[in-house]
Amino acid sequence: MMFDRRFFALVVLLCVSAVRSTEDASDDELNYEMDEGVVVLTDKNFDAFLKKNPSVLVKFYAPWCGHCKHLAPEYEKASSKVSIPLAKVDATVETELGKRFEIQGYPTLKFWKDGKGPNDYDGGRDEAGIVEWVESRVDPNYKPPPEEVVTLTTENFDDFISNNELVLVEFYAPWCGHCKKLAPEYEKAAQKLKAQGSKVKLGKVDATIEKDLGTKYGVSGYPTMKIIRNGRRFDYNGPREAAGIIKYMTDQSKPAAKKLPKLKDVERFMSKDDVTIIGFFATEDSTAFEAFSDSAEMLREEFKTMGHTSDPAAFKKWDAKPNDIIIFYPSLFHSKFEPKSRTYNKAAATSEDLLAFFREHSAPLVGKMTKKNAATRYTKKPLVVVYYNADFSVQYREGSEYWRSKVLNIAQKYQKDKYKFAVADEEEFAKELEELGLGDSGLEHNVVVFGYDGKKYPMNPDEFDGELDENLEAFMKQISSGKAKAHVKSAPAPKDDKGPVKTVVGSNFDKIVNDESKDVLIEFYAPWCGHCKSFESKYVELAQALKKTQPNVVLAKMDATINDAPSQFAVEGFPTIYFAPAGKKSEPIKYSGNRDLEDLKKFMTKHGVKSFQKKDEL
């Protein structure tokens, strides 16, 4: 019995010690440091504090962050005027808390109410704004405003687009960190646009569920944002915070062509380094004005300087007639080989005709190509680009213009052959030059010709080592004679490619895809594309199924991020699938159906030449 009593006493002693230890630990967890009225939270005390204080606003910050430093005194002042604690977490130290609450930037404020949350703080960043936001939400009668961002699905998407003139749509994935960061800003923008009476509507699509919509709109990453105006889609290239979204979309809602009441307004509007398009109209109810306005809307993202005037003084200065629509070339790039402007005036003007006119004459004989204007001013082929230290700012203009004049002398000789010429800054396009093998060419001027065929023809630095005009003249003769060699971006061809799906790279594209003895189905993919990854197993399954029954059809794939394909195989999103039947290699057929095996079989059956004949069994 003595042993039993001693053993029992020992157990009791251990239990008491454990309880005291636990109590001591709890006391440590509830020991919070205060800094100017703000509670300092750490990974150790965070959960205990929230358990004791179920309503709290927490600021996640970084000591080096400028916005955090600006917010700090306002946050401290607000802490003494609100009815709940304000707390802060140094997320550069408490990294686990940062990961737990998916903190993407600084400062990020999170709000808990009655133990529920967190919700993102989207109020002001001053004392009054913080106090107002917090007190409104801790009010027992507070009800959050209804969500203004419309959730779109396959069922309601078309109606929403057709019923609203201007829409911004976000395609997102629930797991995407950037999407989560955008969400409160996007909703805040929608709320404020509504309050302003704006006609702009904001919508969102969960592209992981609405896969057909994602495919239709070329979604290859998240978030992807598209502007849809009167049914036509455009990429959204604006900011991703509320104020920026509001300003960008408000600008988008204004007429694309600016009204210029007086001559002085027109003069100020003229661009020094880009084309300016001015419509001269006696009245705004003419067919020409309507066509001009429609075309301006279609070209809103391409031409930022489009305006119209009715001022007689402006008509007189530029010798314009009513309904003249004039493209003015920037004075910086005038030359004696071309007019300073081009005029369009047709009795039955149409927006389609104007679009063609604008694009045909969107750049001077030799303008400056930049990353900003390359996709709008310099899409017409063949295009000859001369890369050097092209800087037309006042300090370096004379030297840059000297070399441009050399290019002009050659360019004017090829106007009749429809060649378009441009100069470009070699530093701005350093990556592109490196990809073409010209990153360390040793030449002061590098030249690349972008051909009709979609191929790129770099001037070989080992062959052309003279002066610019001499090199360019000789290289253009080589281009015209068809003797220049094209550069093809290509990953190494696989040494062992015995799988059911053939791997195509730039260097073996012609051999595999343009094989006239085979019909070829080719998928263009990106390694990071989720849709491509989910489709891969189905594609392999289809290839295996057809290997024995359809020996004259080849299923292939190509990583379009590291390989060049001919221009007729245009890739705008991932995955993109083309069918190149025998005899029709120059006109491949783009597949636009579901990524379903039976649908793909039907597609190939319909278009097959060497395969899927009537005698073949599916």
From Swiss-Prot:
Reactions it catalyzes: Catalyzes the rearrangement of -S-S- bonds in proteins
Any one GO molecular function term: protein disulfide isomerase activity
Compartments in which it is found: Endoplasmic reticulum lumen
Tagged with keyword Acetylation: no
Xref: Pfam families: Thioredoxin (PF00085), Thioredoxin_6 (PF13848)
Motif mapping: Prevents secretion from ER: 615-618
One term under GO cellular component: cell surface
Family, similarity comment: Belongs to the protein disulfide isomerase family.
PANTHER family, per database record: PROTEIN DISULFIDE ISOMERASE, PROTEIN DISULFIDE-ISOMERASE A4
Name of protein: Probable protein disulfide-isomerase A4
